[in-house]
Amino acid sequence: MNTEATHDQNEAQTTGVRLRNAREQLGLSQQAVAERLCLKVSTVRDIEEDKAPSDLASTFLRGYIRSYARLVHVPEEELLPGLEKQAPLRAAKVAPMQSFSLGKRRKKRDGWLMSFTWLVLFVVVGLTGAWWWQNHKAQQEEITTMADQSTAELNADKDSGQSVPLDTSAATSQDTTPAQTAPAPATPVDSTAATQNTVVAPSQANVDTAATSAAPAATETPSALPTSQAGVAAPAADPNALVMNFTADCWLEVTDATGKKLFSGMQRKDGNLNLTGQAPYKLKIGAPAAVQIQYQGKPVDLSRFIRTNQVARLTLNAEPTPAQ
């Protein structure tokens, strides 16, 4: 009778109450049970109060209760009927696989981003190449145009250069006239000497006088040559002279302050060019790397045009010379 009463009493008790009573008989606290079972104290308390946490699956809850029963020496067979009522098996809700789909979406997004990046890069490279080609083509067309203009100007100069010998002959006649008139004062000396020595006919005296006047003229003519040569070399000493040396073939155009073209055409390799005009000078150089320029005794820096390989357009201003 006592055994049946005890069995009925145990069945009347819930699972949580039986576990709590067994724990108290062993003198264990909830903290000690939680530490031995590696559970939270709140979980042990919920089990003793017959509470099923909503965030805890029934399978885990049944496992915790069985571990608790073994710890406090309560037979598991006696707790099975109560477990079925307290924690019935519920179908676990299987969450859809998020990680794979998320990784797939992320990979797809990264693929679009990479494709867009490459597209932008190709567009930038294409625009840069098109810009460079347009500039290069424009420079080549400009150089060709300038070369054609210089060729036309050279042909025009050749056509108009046939009248040059007439000017030179006039200049030579002007140069020889002073030379012939210069020794005229020497004739009275010669004529007086002739009259003192012998008496000659008037016709012979005129012949001698003409001969003596021609001789000093012949001797005086060479003395006029150095002065004309000095006059030709004088412009080279101009402080505003522009001196250019060419290391390769180069097209060039030089204009002074008055708008006069001092030079426009092609210069060959190892050529030299000295120009004098009114400063400032405006220069247009087709190949800056092929020319070395000196202005007022100082070299002109063309490195910025050489680096970019462009047609050089620059203006050379005159610097004031120090007072002596």
Swiss-Prot record:
Q: Which UniProt keywords apply?
A: Cell inner membrane, Cell membrane, Cell shape, DNA-binding, Membrane, Signal-anchor, Transmembrane, Transmembrane helix
InterPro entries, alphabetically?
Bact_Cytoskel_RodZ (IPR050400), Cro/C1-type_HTH (IPR001387), Lambda_DNA-bd_dom_sf (IPR010982), RodZ (IPR023690), RodZ-like_C (IPR025194)
Chain ranges on the Periplasmic side, renumbered to this chain: 133-324
The keyword Cell membrane is assigned to this record: yes
> Does Cell membrane count among this protein's keywords?
yes
Alphabetical list of NCBIfam families matching this protein: PRK10856.1 (NF008109)
User: Domain description from the entry?
Assistant: The helix-turn-helix (HTH) motif in the cytoplasmic domain of the N-terminus is involved in the formation of spirals to maintain the rigid rod shape. As this protein is anchored in the cytoplasmic membrane, the HTH motif may contribute to protein-protein interactions to form the RodZ helix, which is localized beneath the cytoplasmic membrane. The C-terminal domain may be critical for determination of the rod shape by probably interacting with enzymes required for synthesis of the peptidoglycan layer, including PBPs in the periplasm.
Designated name of the protein? Cytoskeleton protein RodZ
Gene name for this UniProt entry: rodZ
